[in-house]
Amino acid sequence: MTEARTSNVRWFLVLWLFVLSAVSYLDRVNISIAGGAIADAYHLSDVQLGKVFSAMLVGYALFQTTGGRLADRYGPRWVLAAGVVWWGVFTALTAVVPANFSGALFFFVAVRFLLGAGEAVIYPSANQFIARWIPVRERGLANGWVFAGVGAGAGLTPPLVTWMMIHHGWRSSFWVCSIIGFFAGAVWFLIARDTPAGHPQVSAAELAMIESGLTLASTPAASTTNPSTMPHDAPTVLVPWRRVVRSKEVWAVTLSYFCYGYVAWIFFSWFYRYLAKVRGLDLKTSAFYSMLPFLAMLVACLLGGTLNDRLTKWKGPRLGRCVLAAFAIALAGIFIALGSQVKSARLASVVLAGGAGALYLSQSSFWSLTADIAGPSSGSVSGFMNTGCQIGAAITAFLTPWIAARFGWTASFLVAAVLCFVGAASWLVVDPERSLMPGQGTPIAESGQVPVNASL
């Protein structure tokens, strides 16, 4: 460990989590851009294509809690690196199905399901990293950077995949995305460590700052089992599942994240196709305007993370985590309802993009709250929460075209707007200072710190 200087290793690693987050969305959204070409090549209907989209999300949802528990037990370095390799393999396999293959639908569903299973580790692992490496006062911005990768990856996907489709065919986009993933995962494995104390480049000053931000100075038990300093092979003490499933806070944020996932995945799964097929924009114009929601997400994640930290420091976590999230999600519902009524395709794209941005203002609240209340079990608890998100996402992938076919696309967006208001209301019952760890309160409003572990 370097002691002669002050380092910022934690932020360098957060930046690489941003890269991995972007790559994960590059690998999951590419099929929504290539979906039209795939549907034409294999004679798939929109409903069948929706099943392919949903398959990834079902696999992603089913393995959230498993991925989170693995990160809790074995650390974010190994688990995340293994996940990147896994999903890189199945991204590449998406491109190998033979032309005119009669079992193409089954093949695509199976491969995308397994891709989702591998991607399930990314955000629970990132949240476990944040619980170990990032002080409470910085968690909003750190999560903002991680999820800004969603906007960056999803925003890069339409022009990149469209260009490759035009010049090299749809299969090339999956090969390129796979190679990018392998590279990003290898770099993560080389530069990351599970704890700050185990990283050779972390200075004494940075380590002390991290440790003081993760624990309550007046709690002796916290300082003895701080995950930032415990040895790599030390036993990990986790919150029992029975305490997780009895928590009102966990169920409230999971319900809200279910609604969030339903709404967000309209943009990831169907927005490009909606602009091209329903609004009548050409391929290149659709690619440009379909970038707008994702660019809005990128900016909103960073802005939301900054607001999260500042409001929490100013008035406590109820304002910084809960009220901010409720306001942002409700605002998203207003934008989406208005955007669905706009006649101009281009203006509708801008208004709907505003809805996507407003939705992502709340992103840091979900993940910062679970890190705050769960500490060493943040991977498991955030994985449980994210399961709700992915169930919502899987439902929207096939339900959105079904609603559109029977009632029109305006109805599809209005359903999403209603769910925004349900998701916003869910935050009103959350107590952000109710720790899942027995015997520990979370006086964040007073101290700016939260305990991250306890003997169970």
Task: Please report, for each region that a protein language model flagged, where it lies by residue.
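C-terminal transmembrane helical hairpin of 12-TM major facilitator-type secondary transporters
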Residues: R318-F366
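Helix-loop-helix hairpin linking two adjacent transmembrane segments in secondary transporters
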Residues: V150-H199
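A late C-terminal transmembrane helix in Major Facilitator Superfamily
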Residues: C301, A371-R406
